[in-house]
Amino acid sequence: MTATLQQRKSANVWEQFCEWITSTNNRLYIGWFGVLMIPTLLAATTCFIIAFIAAPPVDIDGIREPVAGSLIYGNNIISGAVVPSSNAIGLHFYPIWEAASLDEWLYNGGPYQLVIFHFLTGVFCYLGREWELSYRLGMRPWICLAFSAPVAAATAVFLIYPIGQGSFSDGMPLGISGTFNFMIVFQAEHNILMHPFHMLGVAGVFGGSLFSAMHGSLVTSSLVRETTENESQNYGYKFGQEEETYNIVAAHGYFGRLIFQYASFNNSRQLHFFLAAWPVIGIWFTALGVSTMAFNLNGFNFNQSIIDSQGRVINTWADIINRANLGMEVMHERNAHNFPLDLAAGEVAPVAISAPAING
Protein backbone atom coordinates (compact mmCIF):
# COMPACT_ATOMS: atom_id res chain seq x y z
CA MET A 1 0.00 0.00 0.00
CA THR A 2 1.36 3.39 -0.99
CA ALA A 3 0.40 6.61 0.79
CA THR A 4 0.56 9.84 -1.18
CA LEU A 5 0.82 13.23 0.54
CA GLN A 6 -0.23 16.27 -1.45
CA GLN A 7 1.34 19.47 -0.19
CA ARG A 8 -0.98 22.47 0.02
CA LYS A 9 0.01 25.49 -2.01
CA SER A 10 1.54 28.08 0.26
CA ALA A 11 -0.45 31.30 0.16
CA ASN A 12 1.10 34.63 0.96
CA VAL A 13 0.18 36.53 4.11
CA TRP A 14 -2.38 38.77 2.39
CA GLU A 15 -4.28 35.82 0.90
CA GLN A 16 -4.31 34.09 4.29
CA PHE A 17 -5.64 37.28 5.86
CA CYS A 18 -8.39 37.60 3.21
CA GLU A 19 -9.37 33.97 3.71
CA TRP A 20 -9.57 34.44 7.48
CA ILE A 21 -11.62 37.64 7.19
CA THR A 22 -14.20 36.06 4.88
CA SER A 23 -14.27 32.60 6.47
CA THR A 24 -17.68 31.41 7.69
CA ASN A 25 -15.97 28.86 9.95
CA ASN A 26 -14.93 31.51 12.49
CA ARG A 27 -16.92 31.56 15.72
CA LEU A 28 -17.86 35.15 14.92
CA TYR A 29 -17.95 36.20 11.27
CA ILE A 30 -15.77 39.24 10.60
CA GLY A 31 -16.14 40.09 6.92
CA TRP A 32 -14.88 43.17 5.14
CA PHE A 33 -17.60 45.30 6.68
CA GLY A 34 -16.50 43.98 10.06
CA VAL A 35 -13.00 45.34 9.48
CA LEU A 36 -14.49 48.84 9.73
CA MET A 37 -17.36 47.97 12.09
CA ILE A 38 -15.24 46.62 14.94
CA PRO A 39 -12.95 49.65 15.48
CA THR A 40 -15.73 52.23 14.97
CA LEU A 41 -18.12 50.57 17.42
CA LEU A 42 -15.30 50.08 19.93
CA ALA A 43 -14.38 53.78 19.63
CA ALA A 44 -18.02 54.87 20.02
CA THR A 45 -18.61 52.59 23.02
CA THR A 46 -15.38 53.60 24.77
CA CYS A 47 -15.97 57.33 24.31
CA PHE A 48 -19.62 57.00 25.38
CA ILE A 49 -18.75 55.19 28.62
CA ILE A 50 -15.99 57.66 29.53
CA ALA A 51 -18.13 60.70 28.66
CA PHE A 52 -21.18 59.33 30.49
CA ILE A 53 -19.09 58.88 33.62
CA ALA A 54 -16.71 61.84 33.60
CA ALA A 55 -17.38 64.46 30.88
CA PRO A 56 -17.53 68.07 32.15
CA PRO A 57 -20.64 70.23 31.52
CA VAL A 58 -21.34 71.21 27.89
CA ASP A 59 -22.49 74.61 26.62
CA ILE A 60 -25.24 73.01 24.52
CA ASP A 61 -27.15 76.24 23.70
CA GLY A 62 -24.01 78.27 22.98
CA ILE A 63 -24.97 80.93 25.56
CA ARG A 64 -22.28 80.12 28.14
CA GLU A 65 -24.65 78.13 30.35
CA PRO A 66 -23.15 74.62 30.50
CA VAL A 67 -25.37 71.59 31.11
CA ALA A 68 -23.93 68.71 33.15
CA GLY A 69 -24.62 65.21 31.88
CA SER A 70 -22.06 62.89 33.49
CA LEU A 71 -22.27 60.80 36.64
CA ILE A 72 -19.46 62.50 38.55
CA TYR A 73 -21.19 65.86 38.09
CA GLY A 74 -24.23 64.71 40.06
CA ASN A 75 -26.34 62.72 37.59
CA ASN A 76 -27.62 59.17 37.94
CA ILE A 77 -28.28 56.48 35.33
CA ILE A 78 -31.69 57.99 34.51
CA SER A 79 -30.72 61.66 34.30
CA GLY A 80 -27.22 61.20 32.86
CA ALA A 81 -26.37 61.64 29.17
CA VAL A 82 -23.68 62.54 26.70
CA VAL A 83 -24.79 66.10 25.98
CA PRO A 84 -24.96 67.17 22.30
CA SER A 85 -22.31 69.51 20.94
CA SER A 86 -22.72 73.26 21.34
CA ASN A 87 -25.00 75.41 19.22
CA ALA A 88 -21.92 77.61 18.76
CA ILE A 89 -20.38 74.75 16.77
CA GLY A 90 -23.53 74.27 14.68
CA LEU A 91 -22.99 71.75 11.88
CA HIS A 92 -19.21 72.17 11.80
CA PHE A 93 -17.21 68.97 11.96
CA TYR A 94 -15.52 69.19 15.37
CA PRO A 95 -12.82 66.56 15.93
CA ILE A 96 -10.30 66.94 18.74
CA TRP A 97 -7.67 68.53 16.49
CA GLU A 98 -10.05 71.36 15.53
CA ALA A 99 -10.18 72.62 19.13
CA ALA A 100 -7.54 74.83 20.71
CA SER A 101 -7.36 72.53 23.72
CA LEU A 102 -8.94 69.39 25.13
CA ASP A 103 -10.82 71.53 27.67
CA GLU A 104 -12.37 73.56 24.85
CA TRP A 105 -13.31 70.38 22.98
CA LEU A 106 -15.05 68.98 26.05
CA TYR A 107 -16.78 72.30 26.85
CA ASN A 108 -18.23 72.44 23.33
CA GLY A 109 -19.46 68.84 23.44
CA GLY A 110 -16.92 67.23 21.12
CA PRO A 111 -17.49 63.71 22.54
CA TYR A 112 -21.07 63.74 21.20
CA GLN A 113 -19.90 64.08 17.60
CA LEU A 114 -17.21 61.46 18.12
CA VAL A 115 -19.77 58.98 19.47
CA ILE A 116 -22.53 59.49 16.89
CA PHE A 117 -20.24 59.50 13.83
CA HIS A 118 -18.46 56.33 14.91
CA PHE A 119 -21.74 54.74 16.01
CA LEU A 120 -23.52 55.47 12.72
CA THR A 121 -20.55 54.22 10.72
CA GLY A 122 -20.54 51.08 12.88
CA VAL A 123 -24.23 50.28 12.44
CA PHE A 124 -24.03 50.94 8.69
CA CYS A 125 -21.20 48.40 8.58
CA TYR A 126 -23.18 45.98 10.76
CA LEU A 127 -25.98 46.14 8.18
CA GLY A 128 -23.47 45.49 5.41
CA ARG A 129 -21.96 42.64 7.42
CA GLU A 130 -25.39 41.01 7.69
CA TRP A 131 -25.70 41.13 3.91
CA GLU A 132 -22.14 39.85 3.49
CA LEU A 133 -22.65 36.83 5.77
CA SER A 134 -25.97 36.02 4.06
CA TYR A 135 -24.18 36.13 0.71
CA ARG A 136 -21.39 33.82 1.90
CA LEU A 137 -23.92 31.29 3.22
CA GLY A 138 -26.14 31.41 0.13
CA MET A 139 -29.05 32.92 2.05
CA ARG A 140 -31.54 35.49 0.82
CA PRO A 141 -30.64 39.10 1.73
CA TRP A 142 -33.73 40.14 3.71
CA ILE A 143 -32.12 40.10 7.18
CA CYS A 144 -30.14 43.26 6.47
CA LEU A 145 -33.26 44.80 4.91
CA ALA A 146 -35.13 44.32 8.20
CA PHE A 147 -32.24 45.85 10.14
CA SER A 148 -32.38 48.89 7.85
CA ALA A 149 -35.43 50.11 9.80
CA PRO A 150 -33.64 50.82 13.12
CA VAL A 151 -30.61 52.05 11.14
CA ALA A 152 -32.86 54.56 9.34
CA ALA A 153 -34.39 55.65 12.66
CA ALA A 154 -30.97 56.20 14.27
CA THR A 155 -29.75 58.11 11.21
CA ALA A 156 -32.85 60.32 11.32
CA VAL A 157 -32.44 61.46 14.94
CA PHE A 158 -28.63 61.65 15.04
CA LEU A 159 -27.81 63.01 11.58
CA ILE A 160 -30.74 64.10 9.38
CA TYR A 161 -32.58 66.06 12.08
CA PRO A 162 -29.51 68.07 13.18
CA ILE A 163 -28.73 68.84 9.52
CA GLY A 164 -32.28 70.07 8.93
CA GLN A 165 -32.28 72.18 12.09
CA GLY A 166 -28.82 73.61 11.44
CA SER A 167 -26.96 72.36 14.51
CA PHE A 168 -25.87 69.14 16.17
CA SER A 169 -27.09 70.66 19.44
CA ASP A 170 -30.58 69.67 18.22
CA GLY A 171 -29.60 65.99 17.97
CA MET A 172 -30.92 63.45 20.44
CA PRO A 173 -28.90 63.36 23.70
CA LEU A 174 -27.30 60.00 24.51
CA GLY A 175 -29.19 59.19 27.68
CA ILE A 176 -32.58 58.14 29.06
CA SER A 177 -34.03 61.46 30.24
CA GLY A 178 -32.27 63.19 27.34
CA THR A 179 -34.21 60.97 24.94
CA PHE A 180 -37.48 61.92 26.65
CA ASN A 181 -36.53 65.61 26.50
CA PHE A 182 -35.83 65.22 22.77
CA MET A 183 -39.26 63.64 22.27
CA ILE A 184 -41.08 66.37 24.20
CA VAL A 185 -39.30 69.20 22.37
CA PHE A 186 -39.88 67.43 19.04
CA GLN A 187 -43.61 67.32 19.78
CA ALA A 188 -43.62 70.98 20.81
CA GLU A 189 -41.85 72.20 17.69
CA HIS A 190 -43.11 69.76 15.04
CA ASN A 191 -46.40 68.28 16.34
CA ILE A 192 -45.14 64.78 15.54
CA LEU A 193 -48.16 63.07 17.10
CA MET A 194 -50.30 64.58 14.33
CA HIS A 195 -47.98 63.41 11.54
CA PRO A 196 -49.34 60.48 9.47
CA PHE A 197 -45.91 58.83 9.16
CA HIS A 198 -45.51 58.73 12.94
CA MET A 199 -48.98 57.18 13.18
CA LEU A 200 -47.85 54.47 10.75
CA GLY A 201 -44.79 53.88 12.92
CA VAL A 202 -46.96 53.47 16.03
CA ALA A 203 -49.12 50.99 14.13
CA GLY A 204 -45.95 49.16 13.04
CA VAL A 205 -44.42 48.86 16.52
CA PHE A 206 -47.61 48.10 18.47
CA GLY A 207 -48.99 45.93 15.68
CA GLY A 208 -45.70 44.04 15.43
CA SER A 209 -45.79 43.37 19.18
CA LEU A 210 -49.39 42.15 18.93
CA PHE A 211 -48.68 39.88 15.95
CA SER A 212 -45.55 38.50 17.61
CA ALA A 213 -47.50 37.63 20.75
CA MET A 214 -50.35 36.12 18.70
CA HIS A 215 -47.97 34.01 16.62
CA GLY A 216 -45.94 32.80 19.58
CA SER A 217 -49.00 31.88 21.62
CA LEU A 218 -50.66 30.07 18.69
CA VAL A 219 -47.52 28.04 17.98
CA THR A 220 -46.99 27.21 21.66
CA SER A 221 -50.64 26.17 21.98
CA SER A 222 -50.53 23.83 18.97
CA LEU A 223 -47.24 21.98 19.56
CA VAL A 224 -47.11 18.35 18.51
CA ARG A 225 -46.93 16.29 21.71
CA GLU A 226 -43.58 14.50 21.97
CA THR A 227 -43.14 14.37 25.76
CA THR A 228 -44.98 13.12 28.84
CA GLU A 229 -46.69 15.29 31.41
CA ASN A 230 -43.62 15.00 33.65
CA GLU A 231 -41.19 16.45 31.08
CA SER A 232 -40.70 19.92 29.71
CA GLN A 233 -42.38 20.31 26.34
CA ASN A 234 -39.13 21.88 25.09
CA TYR A 235 -37.53 18.42 25.10
CA GLY A 236 -39.93 17.48 22.31
CA TYR A 237 -37.87 19.42 19.79
CA LYS A 238 -34.49 18.35 18.45
CA PHE A 239 -32.39 20.95 16.65
CA GLY A 240 -32.43 20.31 12.91
CA GLN A 241 -35.36 17.88 12.92
CA GLU A 242 -37.28 17.60 9.66
CA GLU A 243 -40.76 17.23 11.17
CA GLU A 244 -42.89 20.28 11.99
CA THR A 245 -42.83 21.00 15.70
CA TYR A 246 -46.35 22.46 15.69
CA ASN A 247 -49.57 21.84 13.80
CA ILE A 248 -50.19 24.82 11.54
CA VAL A 249 -53.53 23.37 10.47
CA ALA A 250 -54.73 23.36 14.08
CA ALA A 251 -53.47 26.92 14.63
CA HIS A 252 -55.12 28.07 11.39
CA GLY A 253 -58.39 26.40 12.33
CA TYR A 254 -58.40 27.94 15.82
CA PHE A 255 -57.67 31.48 14.70
CA GLY A 256 -59.96 31.25 11.69
CA ARG A 257 -62.85 30.35 13.99
CA LEU A 258 -61.84 32.94 16.59
CA ILE A 259 -61.93 35.84 14.11
CA PHE A 260 -62.88 34.71 10.60
CA GLN A 261 -61.34 32.34 8.09
CA TYR A 262 -59.35 34.79 6.00
CA ALA A 263 -57.84 36.54 9.03
CA SER A 264 -55.60 33.50 9.48
CA PHE A 265 -52.63 32.60 7.29
CA ASN A 266 -52.57 29.12 5.78
CA ASN A 267 -49.09 29.61 4.32
CA SER A 268 -46.16 29.67 6.75
CA ARG A 269 -43.94 31.64 4.36
CA GLN A 270 -46.52 34.35 3.82
CA LEU A 271 -47.08 34.53 7.57
CA HIS A 272 -43.43 35.06 8.45
CA PHE A 273 -42.94 37.60 5.67
CA PHE A 274 -45.87 39.56 7.10
CA LEU A 275 -44.44 39.36 10.63
CA ALA A 276 -41.16 40.85 9.35
CA ALA A 277 -42.59 43.41 6.93
CA TRP A 278 -45.21 45.02 9.21
CA PRO A 279 -42.91 46.58 11.85
CA VAL A 280 -40.11 47.27 9.36
CA ILE A 281 -42.33 49.30 7.03
CA GLY A 282 -43.84 51.14 10.01
CA ILE A 283 -40.42 52.16 11.35
CA TRP A 284 -39.32 53.16 7.85
CA PHE A 285 -42.22 55.59 7.73
CA THR A 286 -41.40 57.04 11.15
CA ALA A 287 -37.78 57.60 10.13
CA LEU A 288 -39.02 59.26 6.94
CA GLY A 289 -41.38 61.42 9.00
CA VAL A 290 -38.60 62.58 11.33
CA SER A 291 -36.42 63.30 8.30
CA THR A 292 -39.11 65.52 6.73
CA MET A 293 -39.91 67.26 10.02
CA ALA A 294 -36.19 67.99 10.27
CA PHE A 295 -36.81 70.53 7.52
CA ASN A 296 -39.98 71.80 9.28
CA LEU A 297 -42.56 69.96 7.18
CA ASN A 298 -44.52 69.33 10.35
CA GLY A 299 -47.57 67.36 11.50
CA PHE A 300 -51.13 68.43 10.74
CA ASN A 301 -52.29 71.70 12.30
CA PHE A 302 -56.01 71.80 13.02
CA ASN A 303 -55.78 74.66 15.54
CA GLN A 304 -58.90 76.85 15.69
CA SER A 305 -60.42 74.91 12.82
CA ILE A 306 -64.02 75.07 14.05
CA ILE A 307 -65.78 78.41 14.57
CA ASP A 308 -69.42 79.29 15.18
CA SER A 309 -71.56 81.68 13.14
CA GLN A 310 -70.20 84.64 15.11
CA GLY A 311 -66.60 83.73 14.34
CA ARG A 312 -65.85 82.45 17.84
CA VAL A 313 -63.52 79.46 18.13
CA ILE A 314 -65.02 76.19 19.32
CA ASN A 315 -62.11 74.36 20.93
CA THR A 316 -61.30 70.82 19.85
CA TRP A 317 -58.62 68.38 20.97
CA ALA A 318 -56.35 69.97 18.36
CA ASP A 319 -56.48 73.21 20.34
CA ILE A 320 -55.69 71.35 23.57
CA ILE A 321 -52.64 69.82 21.88
CA ASN A 322 -51.62 73.24 20.57
CA ARG A 323 -51.75 74.71 24.07
CA ALA A 324 -49.68 71.81 25.42
CA ASN A 325 -47.16 72.30 22.61
CA LEU A 326 -46.78 75.99 23.46
CA GLY A 327 -46.28 75.12 27.11
CA MET A 328 -43.56 72.62 26.30
CA GLU A 329 -41.93 75.04 23.89
CA VAL A 330 -41.61 77.87 26.43
CA MET A 331 -40.06 75.50 28.98
CA HIS A 332 -37.15 74.30 26.87
CA GLU A 333 -34.07 76.45 26.27
CA ARG A 334 -35.71 79.01 28.53
CA ASN A 335 -32.70 81.35 28.53
CA ALA A 336 -32.02 81.09 24.81
CA HIS A 337 -35.39 82.45 23.64
CA ASN A 338 -37.59 85.30 24.84
CA PHE A 339 -40.69 83.80 23.23
CA PRO A 340 -41.63 80.50 21.61
CA LEU A 341 -40.96 80.58 17.88
CA ASP A 342 -44.69 80.29 17.13
CA LEU A 343 -45.45 83.44 19.14
CA ALA A 344 -42.37 85.40 18.07
CA ALA A 345 -43.06 84.78 14.36
CA GLY A 346 -46.63 86.12 14.38
CA GLU A 347 -47.84 89.43 12.99
CA VAL A 348 -47.10 92.55 14.98
CA ALA A 349 -50.16 93.58 17.03
CA PRO A 350 -50.61 97.37 17.44
CA VAL A 351 -50.82 98.48 21.06
CA ALA A 352 -52.14 102.00 20.33
CA ILE A 353 -54.26 103.40 17.50
CA SER A 354 -52.53 106.80 17.47
CA ALA A 355 -49.67 108.39 19.34
CA PRO A 356 -50.61 111.15 21.78
CA ALA A 357 -49.45 114.66 21.04
CA ILE A 358 -46.58 115.86 23.16
CA ASN A 359 -46.65 119.54 23.99
CA GLY A 360 -43.30 120.77 25.23
UniProtKB/Swiss-Prot annotation:
Chlorophyll a PD1 binds at residue 198. The keyword Manganese applies. [CaMn4O5] cluster binds at residues 170, 189, 332-333, 342, 344. Pheophytin a binds at residue 126. It is a multi-pass membrane protein. Residues 345-360 form a propeptide. GO terms for cellular component: photosystem II; plasma membrane-derived thylakoid membrane. It is found in: Cellular thylakoid membrane. Fe cation binds at residues 215, 272. Pfam families: Photo_RC. Chlorophyll a ChlzD1 binds at residue 118. It catalyses: 2 a plastoquinone + 4 hnu + 2 H2O = 2 a plastoquinol + O2. A quinone binds at residues 215, 264-265. HAMAP family: PSII_PsbA_D1. This is Photosystem II protein D1 2.
